[in-house]
Amino acid sequence: MTTETLTVRDLGLRARAAARVLRSLPTARKAAALHAIARELQAREGVILAANARDVAAAEAARLPAHMVARLRLDAASLAAIADDVAAVAQLPDPVGETTPERILPSGIRVSQRRVPLGVLGVIYESRPNVTVDVAALALMSGNAVILRGGKETVNSNAALEGAIRAALASENIPEDAVQVIRDPARERMLELLRLDDLVDAIIPRGGAGLHRFCVENATVPVIVGGIGVVHIYLDESFTRDPADVARAVNLIRNAKVQKPSACNALDTLLIHVRALPVLPAIARDLTAHGVTLRADPPALAALQTAGLEAQAATDADYGTEFLALTASIRTVSGLEEALDFIAAHGNHTDVILTRDPTQAERFVQDVDSAAVMVNASPRFNDGGQLGLGAEVAISTQKLHARGPMGLRELTTTKWVVVGDGQVRE
């Protein structure tokens, strides 16, 4: 019986059985499985790319937006990069089995905490076949089984990728059911996964705000929400006094907005100190040269128009919007306090301050309640690879169970280990 003919509950039962095996696997065997997956992806390049070509053709026939088709498309180079990423995960430190120093309590019992896998993950995502492999690799290395539900646009690609992964696992005598893909793209199957709380330990959605909202509103399984949120940069006056700092600000803001505008850690709103407005034209000129549409409040709009630059008048809706495109809003503030109030109302993902005042920097770090807070660095660094985690399954913007990029450690939890010699509680 293939995963194509199994019910979602069947997948859950098989995943739970596989998870019992995975949680005890030594690091070397998990790493060997990932290297086997990397080899199998390369060996099946023709099959995988042919399946992907069918998905791309169907997407183009359905007139899906160009950016969705681009996310969907694989070629030999991108598949090789995916395989390399899997091999790289195998080199990461394995958090499973880490143990806190043992304490001996007055009762004589010895107490410690040990890091263990979450168990079974359900990951729901859209038109990115690379996520299928990336998430499978992270789940396996952290000792978790995973049930994957991709978008309908990736049905053929995901089936081919799942085949490669499962064949590699079988070659290493690891349960194939550690990685399973829901083949039926119907929303009813997603609902079944969201409500499989007796078998699935956590749901991790990867996609837009609509997908996250649907999961939160319909799941009985705990949902880890992430990847959505408004990104702010506050440009303090102190960072505009030195021409070299102005050049740094222009470069950093360009990187934050232009490098990958569809990313969740791309800039959405620039907050600028009113006394820093004289440098705004230099920033705006650079952004518009790279195709960015600007929406500004009255003081910023006046500064731009006086400099002969095009911009639109911002509306209230432009603040608090995650654009995921070459659009940014600009808001003038009287100082740090107003910037902090604004971010408190609109932020929770990644927020940046550009300042030469260490007191203001520390206040910003202390007061801003976001998954990542940065001083004089691009928000694009809020990424698992960039923060030294090696890879990530998602970027969580909630406070439980994890916050920020979710690497291997964030896919684990802890259990108490108590050792005694017949002690009883008095």
From Swiss-Prot:
Gene Ontology BP annotations: L-proline biosynthetic process
Family: Belongs to the gamma-glutamyl phosphate reductase family.
Annotated PANTHER family: DELTA-1-PYRROLINE-5-CARBOXYLATE SYNTHASE (PTHR11063:SF8), GLUTAMATE SEMIALDEHYDE DEHYDROGENASE (PTHR11063)
UniProt GO molecular function: glutamate-5-semialdehyde dehydrogenase activity; NADP binding
Entries under Pfam families matching the protein: Aldedh
Pathway annotation: Amino-acid biosynthesis; L-proline biosynthesis; L-glutamate 5-semialdehyde from L-glutamate: step 2/2
Functional description taken from the UniProt entry: Catalyzes the NADPH-dependent reduction of L-glutamate 5-phosphate into L-glutamate 5-semialdehyde and phosphate. The product spontaneously undergoes cyclization to form 1-pyrroline-5-carboxylate.
Location(s) in or outside the cell: Cytoplasm
Protein name: Gamma-glutamyl phosphate reductase
A single cellular component GO annotation: cytoplasm
Reaction catalysed by this enzyme: L-glutamate 5-semialdehyde + phosphate + NADP(+) = L-glutamyl 5-phosphate + NADPH + H(+)
Native organism: Deinococcus geothermalis (strain DSM 11300 / CIP 105573 / AG-3a)
Family matches, as SUPFAM superfamilies: ALDH-like
EC number: 1.2.1.41
Keywords associated with the record: Amino-acid biosynthesis, Cytoplasm, NADP, Oxidoreductase, Proline biosynthesis
InterPro entries in the record: Ald_DH/histidinol_DH (IPR016161), Ald_DH_C (IPR016163), Ald_DH_N (IPR016162), Aldehyde_DH_dom (IPR015590), Glu-5-SA_DH (IPR012134), GPR_dom (IPR000965)
Major subcellular location class: cytoplasm
